[in-house]
Amino acid sequence: MRCPYCQSEDTQVKDSRPAEDGAVIRRRRVCSVCGGRFTTFERVQLRDLMVVKKSGRRVPFDRDKLTRSIEVALRKRDVDNDRVERAISGIVRQLESSGEAEVTSDEIGRLAMDALKGIDDIAYIRFASVYRNFSKAVDFHNVIDELTVAETEDDLDA
């Protein structure tokens, strides 16, 4: 593994342990040249997914882009990073295990919204405003109403 600080390929693994309920291996590494320390994650990738954009263009699935989108929605929210990482891994597992080589950007957005709904209401609303392309204040009210109805139904089921 190349050092992110000095680009040397002489790095050593100092610690390995399972993460995300065993779905990932977390490795602490140290560079033999500059002494820099960094963490890497090893995940299983079942297949190369292609994302079909709304324009019809096809691009390779990018887990980092999904992560950034969810992190933007969660900015300044007090949410445990492990919980977020588990949600992202869950989305990726769903996509990879679907058996399809292509997935639409809408499907990825829907899965991200479902995950955020279970994590943080404010992040859910933020993500929905971009994903659903809100243009009026009433769009926000509608999503808040959806959340309120869902919470009321959950309270009745409990």
Swiss-Prot record:
Cofactor remark from the record: Binds 1 zinc ion.
Domain of life, source organism: Bacteria
Stretches assigned to the ATP-cone domain: 49-139
Pfam name, any one: ATP-cone
Chain spans, region Disordered: 1-20
Protein's UniProt keywords contain rRNA processing: no
Zn finger (unnamed) location: 3-34
Transmembrane domains' residue ranges: none
Biased composition (Basic and acidic residues): 11-20
Family: Belongs to the NrdR family.
NCBIfam families listed in its UniProt record: transcriptional regulator NrdR
Protein name: Transcriptional repressor NrdR
High-level lineage: Bacteria, Pseudomonadati, Pseudomonadota, Alphaproteobacteria, Hyphomicrobiales
